[in-house]
Regions:
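Short amphipathic alpha-helical segments and their helix-coil junctions
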Residues: 3-4, 21-32, 129, 133, ...
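Active-site metal-coordination segments of metallo-dependent hydrolases
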Residues: 35-41, 138-146
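Short amphipathic alpha-helical face segments that pack within enzyme cores
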Residues: 44, 147-155
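Metal-dependent nuclease catalytic regions and adjoining charged, substrate-binding loops involved
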Residues: 7-8, 89, 96, 139-142, ...
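Nuclease catalytic cores
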Residues: 5-58, 88-89, 223
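Short, charged, low-complexity patches
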Residues: 38, 145-149, 193, 197
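An acidic intrinsically disordered interaction segment
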Residues: 5-18, 107-119, 188-193
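Catalytic cores of nuclease domains that cleave nucleic-acid phosphodiester backbones
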Residues: 48-138, 147, 161-169, 173-176
Length: 236
């Protein structure tokens, strides 16, 4: 059994940052966490959005009514061969940021799940990446949101050298809102690529080098499946 984390994703990085021990128990020891209704609902909504865009679902479920306009637009774009759209895809890279496939177990270093990405209509070559969120938008998590957008941008710029820029965004389906807000996008160009690569290499370095996985008590411990009071292996 491996004693270190050898590959990563944004969600794996987020869990490690919350608590190294939780990351070990979940990703190395493979101690499975039970599902919950919020996760099941999120999966259902993501699947419904995918099916609607692809034309496999004719009617939107009520949970997606607040983002109906963007979904109808994406559905129309999906029909066009030139749209350059991907829906529910996984982008994967090696340690040198070379493109690979998600199931390259020997060399894949990072996996990035993409809900939908499409090219904007017009002369400029712009890729819009949209991540569906079923939870609530929280202002205090802005730093985390920016990190996620940076990773999307890094991957897109690496994959598509012809792009003028990338505009990643989060879409909160329950609230019908986008972050960043409409008209105020965060843009990334190819000049940002080497900076983003170094930034993410630095961010994940401690996670990939960790061999002790010290627990990190915090406010989320009360919800953790591995907590002591739940009969878990954690001391807290």
């Amino acid at each position: 059994m491996p004693k270190q984390i050898t590959s990563w994703s944004f969600s794996r990085y987020a869990v490690y940052r919350e608590c190294p021990l939780k990351a070990k128990l979940k990703f190395i020891d493979k101690l499975e966490e039970p599902g919950n209704e919020a996760m099941a609902r999120g999966n259902r909504i993501h699947k419904a959005a995918e099916q609607f865009i692809k034309g496999e679902l004719k009617t939107l479920p009520p949970e997606l009514n607040k983002v109906a306009s963007i979904l109808r637009y994406l559905k129309g774009r999906y029909k066009k061969i030139t749209s350059g759209m991907v829906v529910e895809d996984t982008w994967a890279f090696t340690k040198t940021w070379t493109k690979t496939v998600w199931n390259d177990w020997a060399a894949c270093w990072v996996r990035i799940k993409v809900d939908v990405a499409h090219r904007r209509e017009g002369k400029e070559k712009v890729l819009i990446i949209t991540d569906w969120k079923t939870g609530k938008f929280r202002e205090e998590k802005n730093d985390e949101y920016v990190e996620q957008l940076e990773l999307y941008a890094l991957a897109a710029l690496q994959l598509y050298p012809d792009l003028d820029y990338v505009e990643p965004q989060l879409c909160y389906t329950d609230q019908g809102m986008f972050w960043p807000k409409d008209g105020d996008p965060i843009r990334f160009t190819h000049q940002d690529l080497p900076v983003l690569q170094k930034l993410w290499e630095k961010r994940v370095k401690s996670m990939l080098n960790d061999t002790t996985f010290t627990p990190k008590p915090n406010n989320n411990c009360r919800y953790c499946h591995y907590r002591k009071s739940n009969g878990g292996p954690c001391q807290y």
